[in-house]
Protein backbone atom coordinates (compact mmCIF):
# COMPACT_ATOMS: atom_id res chain seq x y z
CA UNK A 1 0.00 0.00 0.00
CA UNK A 2 2.81 2.41 0.87
CA UNK A 3 4.50 1.66 -2.48
CA UNK A 4 1.28 2.60 -4.35
CA UNK A 5 1.02 5.93 -2.52
CA UNK A 6 4.68 6.61 -3.30
CA UNK A 7 4.15 5.92 -7.02
CA UNK A 8 1.01 8.09 -7.16
CA UNK A 9 2.83 10.89 -5.35
CA UNK A 10 5.63 10.87 -7.90
CA UNK A 11 3.06 10.89 -10.69
CA UNK A 12 1.27 14.01 -9.34
CA UNK A 13 4.53 15.84 -8.77
CA UNK A 14 5.49 15.11 -12.36
CA UNK A 15 2.18 16.51 -13.62
CA UNK A 16 2.61 19.73 -11.62
CA UNK A 17 6.17 20.23 -12.84
CA UNK A 18 5.09 19.67 -16.43
CA UNK A 19 2.31 22.25 -16.05
CA UNK A 20 4.73 24.77 -14.61
CA UNK A 21 7.13 24.14 -17.48
CA UNK A 22 4.35 24.76 -20.02
CA UNK A 23 3.67 28.20 -18.44
CA UNK A 24 7.27 29.21 -17.84
CA UNK A 25 6.96 32.20 -20.14
CA UNK A 26 4.14 33.64 -18.01
CA UNK A 27 6.15 33.59 -14.80
CA UNK A 28 9.60 34.35 -16.12
CA UNK A 29 10.25 38.12 -16.52
CA UNK A 30 12.41 37.55 -19.59
CA UNK A 31 9.67 35.35 -21.09
CA UNK A 32 9.17 34.56 -24.74
CA UNK A 33 10.51 36.68 -27.55
CA UNK A 34 7.75 35.50 -29.86
CA UNK A 35 5.54 38.49 -30.80
CA UNK A 36 1.96 38.05 -29.54
CA UNK A 37 -1.08 38.45 -31.75
CA UNK A 38 -2.58 41.86 -32.48
CA UNK A 39 -5.55 43.22 -30.54
CA UNK A 40 -8.86 43.03 -32.40
CA UNK A 41 -11.96 45.09 -33.18
CA UNK A 42 -10.67 48.48 -32.00
CA UNK A 43 -13.28 51.20 -31.47
CA UNK A 44 -12.84 54.82 -30.39
CA UNK A 45 -14.63 57.25 -28.08
CA UNK A 46 -13.36 60.77 -28.76
CA UNK A 47 -13.05 63.27 -25.91
CA UNK A 48 -11.82 66.89 -25.58
CA UNK A 49 -8.09 66.63 -26.28
CA UNK A 50 -8.14 62.86 -25.76
CA UNK A 51 -9.68 59.56 -26.82
CA UNK A 52 -10.50 56.18 -25.30
CA UNK A 53 -9.62 53.18 -27.46
CA UNK A 54 -11.49 49.95 -26.78
CA UNK A 55 -10.36 46.60 -28.19
CA UNK A 56 -10.64 42.83 -27.86
CA UNK A 57 -7.61 41.03 -26.50
CA UNK A 58 -6.19 38.14 -28.53
CA UNK A 59 -6.33 34.62 -27.11
CA UNK A 60 -2.59 34.54 -26.65
CA UNK A 61 -0.92 33.48 -23.39
CA UNK A 62 2.21 35.32 -24.46
CA UNK A 63 0.46 38.73 -24.14
CA UNK A 64 1.71 40.82 -21.23
CA UNK A 65 0.34 44.28 -22.08
CA UNK A 66 -0.86 46.57 -24.87
CA UNK A 67 1.10 49.66 -25.90
CA UNK A 68 -0.27 52.70 -27.69
CA UNK A 69 2.18 54.92 -29.55
CA UNK A 70 1.30 58.26 -31.13
CA UNK A 71 3.02 61.45 -32.27
CA UNK A 72 2.12 64.88 -30.92
CA UNK A 73 4.22 68.03 -30.70
CA UNK A 74 6.95 66.29 -32.72
CA UNK A 75 7.33 63.75 -29.93
CA UNK A 76 6.35 60.10 -29.62
CA UNK A 77 4.17 59.38 -26.60
CA UNK A 78 3.36 55.92 -25.31
CA UNK A 79 0.66 54.53 -23.04
CA UNK A 80 0.64 50.99 -21.64
CA UNK A 81 -2.37 48.94 -20.53
CA UNK A 82 -2.17 45.53 -18.83
CA UNK A 83 -3.95 42.45 -20.17
CA UNK A 84 -6.46 42.83 -17.33
CA UNK A 85 -8.16 45.70 -19.16
CA UNK A 86 -9.60 46.13 -22.64
CA UNK A 87 -9.09 49.87 -23.17
CA UNK A 88 -6.61 52.69 -22.82
CA UNK A 89 -6.65 56.49 -22.92
CA UNK A 90 -4.51 58.62 -25.24
CA UNK A 91 -4.40 62.30 -24.34
CA UNK A 92 -2.46 65.53 -24.65
CA UNK A 93 -3.50 66.34 -28.22
CA UNK A 94 -2.86 70.04 -28.91
CA UNK A 95 -5.71 70.66 -31.34
CA UNK A 96 -8.91 69.15 -32.62
CA UNK A 97 -8.27 66.83 -35.58
CA UNK A 98 -7.40 63.34 -36.74
CA UNK A 99 -4.38 61.46 -35.39
CA UNK A 100 -2.95 57.98 -35.92
CA UNK A 101 -2.42 55.76 -32.89
CA UNK A 102 -0.48 52.50 -33.24
CA UNK A 103 -1.51 49.64 -30.94
CA UNK A 104 1.07 46.96 -30.18
CA UNK A 105 0.68 43.69 -28.30
CA UNK A 106 3.78 43.14 -26.15
CA UNK A 107 5.09 39.81 -24.86
CA UNK A 108 6.76 38.94 -21.56
CA UNK A 109 10.06 39.19 -23.41
CA UNK A 110 9.13 42.68 -24.72
CA UNK A 111 8.61 41.39 -28.26
CA UNK A 112 6.00 43.49 -30.07
CA UNK A 113 3.41 42.60 -32.64
CA UNK A 114 2.94 44.43 -35.90
CA UNK A 115 0.99 47.62 -35.15
CA UNK A 116 -2.74 48.03 -35.53
CA UNK A 117 -3.26 51.63 -36.70
CA UNK A 118 -6.32 53.31 -35.16
CA UNK A 119 -7.50 56.77 -36.15
CA UNK A 120 -8.73 59.03 -33.34
CA UNK A 121 -10.38 62.45 -33.68
CA UNK A 122 -10.19 64.24 -30.32
CA UNK A 123 -12.44 67.25 -29.79
CA UNK A 124 -11.18 70.74 -28.93
CA UNK A 125 -8.78 70.35 -25.97
CA UNK A 126 -9.77 71.81 -22.59
CA UNK A 127 -7.12 74.55 -22.56
CA UNK A 128 -8.63 76.02 -25.74
CA UNK A 129 -12.21 75.58 -24.56
CA UNK A 130 -11.49 77.28 -21.24
CA UNK A 131 -9.78 80.17 -23.05
CA UNK A 132 -13.09 80.89 -24.79
CA UNK A 133 -14.89 81.28 -21.45
CA UNK A 134 -12.53 83.81 -19.81
CA UNK A 135 -14.15 86.99 -18.51
CA UNK A 136 -12.26 89.70 -16.62
CA UNK A 137 -13.47 92.51 -14.38
CA UNK A 138 -11.84 95.16 -12.24
CA UNK A 139 -11.93 94.63 -8.50
CA UNK A 140 -10.23 95.92 -5.39
CA UNK A 141 -6.47 96.03 -5.83
CA UNK A 142 -6.52 94.10 -9.09
CA UNK A 143 -8.71 92.10 -11.43
CA UNK A 144 -11.08 89.17 -11.15
CA UNK A 145 -11.12 86.42 -13.79
CA UNK A 146 -14.05 84.05 -14.29
CA UNK A 147 -13.70 80.76 -16.16
CA UNK A 148 -15.57 77.55 -17.00
CA UNK A 149 -13.74 74.20 -17.03
CA UNK A 150 -16.45 71.54 -17.55
CA UNK A 151 -13.93 68.71 -18.02
CA UNK A 152 -12.21 69.62 -14.71
CA UNK A 153 -8.90 69.51 -16.56
CA UNK A 154 -5.63 70.28 -14.79
CA UNK A 155 -4.83 73.76 -16.06
CA UNK A 156 -2.86 76.88 -15.30
CA UNK A 157 -4.49 80.25 -15.97
CA UNK A 158 -1.84 82.92 -16.29
CA UNK A 159 -2.08 86.70 -16.09
CA UNK A 160 0.49 89.01 -17.67
CA UNK A 161 0.77 92.77 -17.24
CA UNK A 162 2.18 95.41 -19.54
CA UNK A 163 4.82 97.44 -17.73
CA UNK A 164 5.47 101.14 -18.31
CA UNK A 165 8.38 100.39 -20.65
CA UNK A 166 6.12 98.21 -22.80
CA UNK A 167 7.45 94.87 -21.55
CA UNK A 168 4.95 92.14 -20.65
CA UNK A 169 5.61 90.24 -17.41
CA UNK A 170 3.70 87.44 -15.73
CA UNK A 171 2.13 88.55 -12.45
CA UNK A 172 0.06 85.50 -11.49
CA UNK A 173 -0.61 81.84 -12.29
CA UNK A 174 -3.77 80.16 -11.04
CA UNK A 175 -3.72 76.35 -10.98
CA UNK A 176 -7.04 74.55 -11.01
CA UNK A 177 -8.95 71.34 -11.56
CA UNK A 178 -12.25 72.99 -10.64
CA UNK A 179 -15.28 72.91 -12.90
CA UNK A 180 -15.19 76.69 -12.96
CA UNK A 181 -15.06 79.75 -10.74
CA UNK A 182 -13.24 83.00 -10.11
CA UNK A 183 -9.70 83.90 -9.18
CA UNK A 184 -8.23 87.24 -8.19
CA UNK A 185 -4.98 89.06 -8.91
CA UNK A 186 -4.26 91.48 -6.06
CA UNK A 187 -1.71 94.04 -4.99
CA UNK A 188 -1.96 96.24 -8.09
CA UNK A 189 -2.13 100.02 -8.30
CA UNK A 190 -5.41 101.74 -9.06
CA UNK A 191 -4.34 102.88 -12.54
CA UNK A 192 -5.54 101.85 -15.98
CA UNK A 193 -3.49 98.81 -16.97
CA UNK A 194 -3.24 96.41 -19.92
CA UNK A 195 -3.50 92.74 -18.97
CA UNK A 196 -3.28 89.47 -20.83
CA UNK A 197 -4.89 86.19 -19.74
CA UNK A 198 -3.95 82.78 -21.15
CA UNK A 199 -4.45 79.07 -20.40
CA UNK A 200 -1.76 76.38 -20.20
CA UNK A 201 -2.30 72.63 -19.90
CA UNK A 202 -0.02 70.05 -18.26
CA UNK A 203 1.64 69.24 -21.58
CA UNK A 204 2.77 72.84 -22.00
CA UNK A 205 0.22 73.82 -24.65
CA UNK A 206 -0.65 77.53 -24.56
CA UNK A 207 -3.86 79.16 -25.69
CA UNK A 208 -3.92 82.48 -27.45
CA UNK A 209 -4.02 85.45 -25.07
CA UNK A 210 -7.08 87.45 -24.08
CA UNK A 211 -6.00 91.09 -23.89
CA UNK A 212 -8.02 93.42 -21.65
CA UNK A 213 -7.67 96.87 -20.15
CA UNK A 214 -8.86 97.29 -16.56
CA UNK A 215 -8.52 99.87 -13.79
CA UNK A 216 -8.14 98.15 -10.39
CA UNK A 217 -10.16 99.74 -7.61
CA UNK A 218 -8.33 101.39 -4.76
CA UNK A 219 -7.78 99.05 -1.80
CA UNK A 220 -6.26 99.57 1.63
CA UNK A 221 -5.98 97.65 4.85
CA UNK A 222 -8.67 98.66 7.31
CA UNK A 223 -7.29 100.70 10.21
CA UNK A 224 -7.13 98.25 13.13
CA UNK A 225 -6.45 101.06 15.62
CA UNK A 226 -10.12 101.99 15.28
CA UNK A 227 -11.46 98.49 15.96
CA UNK A 228 -13.49 98.03 19.16
CA UNK A 229 -15.00 94.88 20.63
CA UNK A 230 -18.72 94.76 21.34
CA UNK A 231 -20.53 92.80 24.05
CA UNK A 232 -23.91 92.03 22.54
CA UNK A 233 -26.19 89.94 24.79
CA UNK A 234 -26.47 86.94 22.43
CA UNK A 235 -22.77 86.77 21.52
CA UNK A 236 -19.89 84.61 22.78
CA UNK A 237 -17.52 87.50 23.44
CA UNK A 238 -15.95 86.29 26.70
CA UNK A 239 -12.64 84.47 26.43
CA UNK A 240 -11.56 81.18 27.97
CA UNK A 241 -10.74 81.73 31.67
CA UNK A 242 -7.10 80.55 31.73
CA UNK A 243 -6.26 82.98 28.95
CA UNK A 244 -8.17 85.80 30.62
CA UNK A 245 -6.46 85.32 33.96
CA UNK A 246 -2.91 84.58 32.85
CA UNK A 247 -2.50 86.54 29.64
CA UNK A 248 -5.27 89.12 29.47
CA UNK A 249 -6.58 87.41 26.36
CA UNK A 250 -9.80 88.71 24.83
CA UNK A 251 -11.33 89.70 21.50
CA UNK A 252 -8.98 92.65 21.07
CA UNK A 253 -6.18 90.16 20.36
CA UNK A 254 -7.75 89.72 16.92
CA UNK A 255 -6.29 93.04 15.79
CA UNK A 256 -3.11 93.44 17.88
CA UNK A 257 -0.83 92.32 15.03
CA UNK A 258 0.58 89.36 17.00
CA UNK A 259 0.20 86.13 15.03
CA UNK A 260 3.06 83.89 16.18
CA UNK A 261 2.44 83.40 19.90
CA UNK A 262 -0.24 83.65 22.57
CA UNK A 263 -2.33 85.53 23.50
CA UNK A 264 -5.10 84.79 21.05
CA UNK A 265 -8.87 85.02 21.26
CA UNK A 266 -10.49 81.77 22.39
CA UNK A 267 -14.11 81.59 23.46
CA UNK A 268 -15.11 79.79 26.65
CA UNK A 269 -15.04 75.99 26.56
CA UNK A 270 -18.52 76.00 28.11
CA UNK A 271 -20.03 77.64 25.03
CA UNK A 272 -21.70 75.77 22.19
CA UNK A 273 -21.73 76.10 18.42
CA UNK A 274 -22.90 77.88 16.42
CA UNK A 275 -21.68 81.02 18.17
CA UNK A 276 -20.77 84.56 17.17
CA UNK A 277 -18.84 87.64 18.22
CA UNK A 278 -19.17 91.26 17.05
CA UNK A 279 -16.83 94.22 16.68
CA UNK A 280 -16.91 97.80 15.44
CA UNK A 281 -14.38 98.75 12.71
CA UNK A 282 -14.75 102.43 13.63
CA UNK A 283 -15.41 103.43 10.01
CA UNK A 284 -17.63 102.29 7.19
CA UNK A 285 -15.84 100.19 4.56
CA UNK A 286 -16.69 98.65 1.25
CA UNK A 287 -14.83 95.41 2.04
CA UNK A 288 -12.99 93.32 -0.52
CA UNK A 289 -11.35 90.49 1.44
CA UNK A 290 -9.92 89.41 4.77
CA UNK A 291 -7.10 87.26 6.13
CA UNK A 292 -7.71 84.87 9.02
CA UNK A 293 -4.85 83.52 11.14
CA UNK A 294 -5.76 80.75 13.55
CA UNK A 295 -3.65 79.58 16.49
CA UNK A 296 -0.15 79.46 15.05
CA UNK A 297 3.24 78.96 16.74
CA UNK A 298 6.50 78.96 14.72
CA UNK A 299 7.59 75.43 13.92
CA UNK A 300 4.60 73.85 15.67
CA UNK A 301 1.62 75.42 13.88
CA UNK A 302 -0.35 75.37 17.12
CA UNK A 303 -3.94 74.38 16.57
CA UNK A 304 -4.17 75.45 12.95
CA UNK A 305 -6.51 73.20 10.95
CA UNK A 306 -7.56 71.38 14.12
CA UNK A 307 -9.17 71.98 17.53
CA UNK A 308 -11.10 75.28 17.61
CA UNK A 309 -9.98 76.57 14.21
CA UNK A 310 -13.24 77.68 12.48
CA UNK A 311 -14.14 75.28 9.66
CA UNK A 312 -17.50 76.58 8.41
CA UNK A 313 -18.35 80.16 9.28
CA UNK A 314 -20.27 83.24 8.13
CA UNK A 315 -19.46 86.94 7.97
CA UNK A 316 -22.27 89.41 8.63
CA UNK A 317 -22.25 93.19 8.39
CA UNK A 318 -24.32 96.08 9.72
CA UNK A 319 -24.38 99.84 10.00
CA UNK A 320 -26.88 100.04 12.85
CA UNK A 321 -26.96 96.77 14.83
CA UNK A 322 -29.78 96.07 17.24
CA UNK A 323 -28.33 96.54 20.77
CA UNK A 324 -30.24 93.52 22.06
CA UNK A 325 -28.06 91.24 19.90
CA UNK A 326 -30.88 90.02 17.68
CA UNK A 327 -30.02 88.60 14.27
CA UNK A 328 -32.66 90.76 12.61
CA UNK A 329 -32.88 92.91 9.48
CA UNK A 330 -30.17 95.20 10.82
CA UNK A 331 -27.66 92.51 9.75
CA UNK A 332 -26.84 91.39 6.21
CA UNK A 333 -24.96 88.22 5.28
CA UNK A 334 -21.77 89.20 3.48
CA UNK A 335 -20.80 85.61 2.65
CA UNK A 336 -20.40 82.03 3.91
CA UNK A 337 -16.97 80.40 4.10
CA UNK A 338 -15.15 77.12 4.55
CA UNK A 339 -11.59 76.76 5.79
CA UNK A 340 -9.74 74.33 3.49
CA UNK A 341 -6.15 73.13 3.67
CA UNK A 342 -4.25 74.04 0.49
CA UNK A 343 -3.27 70.37 0.30
CA UNK A 344 -6.90 69.27 0.52
CA UNK A 345 -6.06 67.13 3.55
CA UNK A 346 -8.29 66.33 6.50
CA UNK A 347 -7.97 67.22 10.18
CA UNK A 348 -5.76 64.20 10.96
CA UNK A 349 -3.48 64.55 7.93
CA UNK A 350 0.00 65.94 8.41
CA UNK A 351 0.47 69.53 7.28
CA UNK A 352 2.25 69.96 3.96
CA UNK A 353 4.57 72.87 3.23
CA UNK A 354 1.62 74.69 1.62
CA UNK A 355 -0.52 74.06 4.71
CA UNK A 356 2.23 75.41 6.96
CA UNK A 357 2.51 78.57 4.86
CA UNK A 358 -1.26 79.08 5.18
CA UNK A 359 -0.98 78.57 8.93
CA UNK A 360 1.76 81.18 9.17
CA UNK A 361 0.46 83.80 6.74
CA UNK A 362 -3.26 83.21 7.16
CA UNK A 363 -6.12 82.09 4.97
CA UNK A 364 -7.47 84.55 2.41
CA UNK A 365 -11.20 84.93 1.91
CA UNK A 366 -12.99 87.04 -0.69
CA UNK A 367 -15.94 89.27 0.14
CA UNK A 368 -18.31 89.40 -2.87
CA UNK A 369 -18.30 92.55 -4.96
CA UNK A 370 -22.04 93.01 -4.38
CA UNK A 371 -21.68 93.10 -0.58
CA UNK A 372 -22.77 96.45 0.91
CA UNK A 373 -20.48 98.84 2.75
CA UNK A 374 -20.62 98.19 6.51
CA UNK A 375 -19.09 99.37 9.78
CA UNK A 376 -19.90 96.50 12.15
CA UNK A 377 -18.75 92.92 11.65
CA UNK A 378 -20.29 89.77 13.11
CA UNK A 379 -18.30 86.55 12.82
CA UNK A 380 -20.45 83.44 13.20
CA UNK A 381 -18.72 80.06 13.67
CA UNK A 382 -20.90 77.11 12.67
CA UNK A 383 -18.34 74.36 13.34
CA UNK A 384 -14.61 73.90 13.85
CA UNK A 385 -11.95 71.58 12.45
CA UNK A 386 -11.81 69.68 15.74
CA UNK A 387 -15.59 69.62 16.32
CA UNK A 388 -15.05 71.60 19.55
CA UNK A 389 -17.58 73.63 21.56
CA UNK A 390 -15.38 76.73 21.26
CA UNK A 391 -13.35 78.55 18.60
CA UNK A 392 -9.97 80.28 18.58
CA UNK A 393 -8.33 82.87 16.31
CA UNK A 394 -5.12 84.88 16.38
CA UNK A 395 -5.80 87.67 13.91
CA UNK A 396 -8.35 89.08 11.47
CA UNK A 397 -7.18 91.60 8.86
CA UNK A 398 -9.66 93.29 6.54
CA UNK A 399 -9.13 95.12 3.24
CA UNK A 400 -11.32 97.44 1.21
CA UNK A 401 -12.02 101.13 0.73
CA UNK A 402 -13.45 103.71 3.12
CA UNK A 403 -17.03 104.55 2.29
CA UNK A 404 -18.36 107.99 3.22
Question: What feature does the model see in each segment?
Answer:
Residues 57, 61-96, 160-190, 331-342, ...:
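Recognizes extended acidic, P/S/T-rich segments that occur
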Residues 214-284, 295-296, 300, 348-349, ...:
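Disordered, acidic Ser/Thr/Pro-rich linker "stalks" and the adjacent N-terminal cap
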Residues 90-116, 181-217:
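Beta-strand-rich modules
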Residues 21-60, 95, 112-152, 208-232, ...:
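Pro/Thr/Ser/Gly-rich low-complexity, intrinsically disordered linker/stalk tracts
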Residues 162-183, 198-245:
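Preference for solvent-exposed, low-hydrophobicity sequence contexts
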Residues 16-19:
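C-terminal motif of bacterial Sec signal peptides marking the signal peptidase cleavage site
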Amino acid sequence: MKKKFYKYGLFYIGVVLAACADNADLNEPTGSTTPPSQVLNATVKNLPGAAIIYYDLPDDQNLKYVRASYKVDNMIRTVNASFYTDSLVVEGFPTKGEYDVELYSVSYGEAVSTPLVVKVSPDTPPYQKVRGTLISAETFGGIKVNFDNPEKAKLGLGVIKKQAEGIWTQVYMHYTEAKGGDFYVRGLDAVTTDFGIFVRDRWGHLSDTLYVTETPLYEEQCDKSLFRKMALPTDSYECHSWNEVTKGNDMTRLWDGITDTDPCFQTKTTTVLPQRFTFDMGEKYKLSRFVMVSRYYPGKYGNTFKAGHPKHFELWGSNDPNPDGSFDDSWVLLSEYESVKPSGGGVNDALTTEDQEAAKNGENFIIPDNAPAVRYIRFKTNDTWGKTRYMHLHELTFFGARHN
